[in-house]
Regions:
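Aromatic- and glycine-rich beta-strand/loop motifs that create alpha-glucan
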Residues: 2-17, 21-66, 279
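Junction motif at the cytosolic side of a transmembrane helix
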Residues: 2-25, 75-78, 156, 243-245, ...
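Short hydrophobic, aromatic-rich alpha-helical segments embedded in or entering the lipid bilayer
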Residues: 37-45, 215-253
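Hydrophobic alpha-helical transmembrane segments of multi-pass membrane transport/permease proteins
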Residues: 55-81, 86-101, 202-208, 260
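Hydrophobic/aromatic residues in alpha-helical transmembrane segments
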Residues: 70-75, 98-105, 149, 181-182, ...
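Transmembrane helix segments
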Residues: 76-79, 190-232
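Hydrophobic alpha-helical transmembrane segments of multi-pass membrane transport proteins
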Residues: 85-157
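Alpha-helical transmembrane segments and their short interhelical loops
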Residues: 128-129, 133-200, 248-259, 264-266
């Protein structure tokens, strides 16, 4: 039995095999990469989503636009002009946004959650808000050409003035933010992928029925339900722009409601993403 002097056993002289790797600091933990800032991370997610959906973009735009143009052609035999024509054209144009931003984004996040794809995003050093906002912005941007084509075709079909169609530059992003946030929240909160798809389809159907049909002909309970739908205020803002002298204060108020709903819905979607990613 050999004796070892106390001086020979110094702190750190005895190391286990599992602790023999080089240490980068005093606590032995390797430093992690710093979390990316919100705006650069958002831009990266946005570009990645655009690249991922590039192949499906043309068919997607065709389906969404063809659907809205077909609805306007069908309604042309029923509606002659006036407020009803404005409602049909504005509702059909915003329907393109609802088809993509609400319906398809709900399906995308529902599929991502069901397949475990959220685990991939959870490993990236990006803020949860960047994932949600980047995907929402990418899906909403898909709708710009289709919405513009639908508005121009509808204006020509019903003889509406096109002088103020520039308001689409505000209607599309604001209503897109509100509907995309709602779609992302539905997809992330739905317990099953099938329910996420169903919620997206029901939301798009509500945007169709409550947006295209003139509000004056709706029963009171349906009119109240219409007021709760975020796309309604984008439809109202666009419909008012077809007037000879639009009331821009009311248009701005409608767009302000879209913006407020967009902030709330995207915040809920970000919370839902955090909740789903840690499960």
């Amino acid at each position: 039995m050999s004796a070892v002097s106390a001086e020979a056993v110094t702190p750190g002289a005895v190391r286990s095999g599992s602790d023999s790797r080089p240490r980068s600091g005093g606590d032995g933990a390797a430093p992690l990469a710093p979390r990316a800032k919100l705006l650069p991370a958002l831009a990266a997610v946005y570009r990645a989503q655009l690249s991922r959906a590039r192949v499906a973009r043309i068919p997607l735009l065709f389906v969404a636009t063809f659907q809205s143009v077909g609805i306007m052609i069908m309604m042309r035999g029923v509606v002659d002009g006036g407020d009803e024509a404005r409602a049909v054209v504005a509702g059909s144009s915003v329907l393109v946004v609802a088809f993509v931003a609400l319906n398809l984004l709900a399906q995308y996040f529902g599929q991502l959650r069901a397949s475990g794809g959220l685990d991939h995003y959870a490993t990236l050093p990006v803020p949860p808000a960047a994932v949600v906002l980047g995907a929402a912005a990418a899906y909403a941007s898909f709708t710009v050409p289709g919405t513009a084509v639908t508005a121009v075709v509808g204006s020509a079909l019903f003889g509406l003035p096109m002088a103020h169609l520039w308001v689409l530059a505000a209607v599309v992003p604001l209503s897109g933010a509100a509907l995309a946030g709602l779609g992302a929240a539905l997809g992330l909160l739905a317990p099953r992928q099938e329910l996420a798809t169903l919620c997206g389809q029901l939301g798009m159907s509500a945007a169709l029925l409550l947006g295209v049909l003139p509000a004056a002909h709706m029963p009171a309970p349906i009119a109240y339900a219409r007021d709760l739908l975020p796309s309604t205020y984008g439809v109202e803002a666009l419909a008012r722009s077809f007037d000879a002298r639009p009331d821009w204060a009311v248009v701005a108020a409608d767009l302000g409601v879209c913006a407020a709903v967009g902030v709330v819905s995207l915040a809920v979607a970000t919370w839902a993403y955090r909740r789903a990613a840690v499960r």
